[in-house]
Amino acid sequence: MDWKIELIFVPVTDVDRAKEFYVRIGFNADYDQSPSEGMRFVQMTPPGSACSIAFGTGLGITLAPGLQNTIQVVVPDADAAHAQLLAAGVKA
């Protein structure tokens, strides 16, 4: 049986700012809805990835922002990825 990771929750303090950041570095904004009062769910996916990240408000996530620091991103060209991040204004 194949097991695949499809969604990783990332705690953030500012949902709009986080969404803008991920869009700026090239992620697709797949979903941004408030299914109920006090809840907002945002799903972002890097181009070519089968795994997305999710964040929002009212989701019951208990991790403090900044503690999710072990996500591994695989790219075919690290130098090109680094250049893309720098061009998007990310400090490396």
Task: Kindly give the residue locations of the regions a language model identified.
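Vicinal oxygen chelate
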Residues: 1, 7, 12-16, 32-33, 40-43, 47-49, 65-92, ...
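Structural motif
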Residues: 24-25, 88
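Small-side-chain structural scaffolding
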Residues: 8, 18, 42, 54-56, ...
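Conserved short beta-strand elements that form part of the metal-binding/catalytic scaffold
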Residues: 28-66
